[in-house]
Amino acid sequence: MSSNLFNPTRRQLLQGTAALAAAGLVGVRPGFAAAVDWKRFAGTTLDVNLVKSPRSDTLIKYLAEFEELTGIKVNAEATPEQQQRQKTVIELSSGKPSFDVVHLSYHVQKRQFEKGGWLADISGYLADPTLTDPGLVENDFADAGMLFAKDGQGVLRSLPFSVDYWIVYWNKELFEAKGLKYPETFEQLVAAAEALTDPSTNTYGFVARGIKNANTPVWTSLMLGYDMTPLDAQGKLRTTSPEAIEAAGLYQRLMTKSAPPGVTGFNWAEAQSAFLQGKIGMWFDGVGFAPPMENPEKSRVVGKVGYGVMPKGPKAHAAGTFGDGIGVTATSEKKEAAYLFCQWAVSPV
């Protein structure tokens, strides 16, 4: 594939949410074909390291089904993103990680994992009919997912767990109260955010990630609307270009004029939590964070949320695409059993 992961084509930016990156939500045990002996590693115990998110919550919810299917015992740990990343780097760098399966954020950790040689080559497993159900083939995954999952030599190092484009979650009730329509342009986005903001009622028009590092995709996603990517074709930074600076100014305005106090310390979890309370007009983040919106046990905005495409920028209409993977550690002594878990984790509902 000729396109560069860190300088994707417009088609790739606009295309990809989960083919599974298709599968997205893990769930009920699929009707796997008999060619795969799912009991082959019965009695094995796997340790699985996950990022806590709506997807990992769903995965853990259905773990008993995998254990019943395979006879494999799974010890799964799901920790918040920043802590999980620290833990994985420390343990993988030691050469003796405590886990067989690891969840990684492609857009943050792909190069680091490849440089460290931390993930096993699973290309052969995907092609092995005794390990992979015939209903799962490479073409089942979105192109963006495979671009993320393969290293520079085309070796498959993980299975795409998600490929998310970014959207705008918007509170239809708050918009209606102000007589506002969903914004179609960046200019309208700013105007709506400021019109919705009323600190006296603790209501704010916009929220997004503000904490260092996690805030980068917010800025770079806005850059796309100026027809600008962070890197050029030679891999050189374009973050000081006029377009990048203008996008940074837009981001700054949204966060300083329309966002709640303390937003500079927010990651996605804090931004999501704020939106769920019903006092935020718009939240800008990945489509994969949608499930809690309609969960009455977690959300005060059930039935009130709109899921909008990214508004059009001054020069382009685009959405950033980000992905997570799930792979087998290179040092695991249970690689094939661990691969069975990865396969199950990305299986269709």
Question: For the regions a protein language model found, what residue spans apply to each?
Answer:
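N-terminal secretory signal peptides
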Residues: 1-9, 19-26
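Extracytoplasmic "Venus flytrap"/periplasmic binding protein-like
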Residues: 61-141, 173, 177-184, 274, ...
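Short, well-ordered beta-strand elements
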Residues: 42-53, 73-77, 100-101
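Extracytoplasmic/periplasmic substrate-binding proteins
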Residues: 111, 217-221, 249-343
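Hinge/lid segment of periplasmic solute-binding proteins
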Residues: 34-40, 106-165, 190, 302-306
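Extracytoplasmic/periplasmic solute-binding protein
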Residues: 146-161, 166, 187-237, 280
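Immediate post-signal peptide segment of exported/extracytoplasmic ligand-binding proteins
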Residues: 32-47, 68, 153-155, 176, ...
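Glycine-centered hinge/linker elements that transmit conformational signals in sensory
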Residues: 192-195, 199, 234-264, 310
